Amino acid sequence: MSSTSEELLQKKCLPCEGGVEACSLEQAKSQRSAVPNWELRPDGKWIERSVRFKNFVKMIEAVNQIAELSEAEGHHPDLHLTGYRNLKIELTTHAIGGLSDNDFILAAKIDAILAQSGL
């Protein structure tokens, strides 16, 4: 069942040590509609977002905010910094080898952080 962005912002990531099914490709497509700035990889196992910041300092500020959020949620993205101001954010639930609700919850919360940066 898909959620809206507002609903995702109200949720908290739940610990996932495996033992649950990853979202199917159809479920992932449905959930992705709540986080339209994110791309779903063709295999349906990852979502990602690329962002270009005004400068290096603004990018690092956002990375630090994402790090704090990730620690609080207990769910962590892969972050790739390139070209001094480009950030690629990738989300998957490693324990299950695919996407879970946690990925979409964290994506919505990362979007809120990036919106504060004017992105």
Residue ranges of model-derived segments:
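Long, contiguous binding/interaction regions
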Residues: 1-119
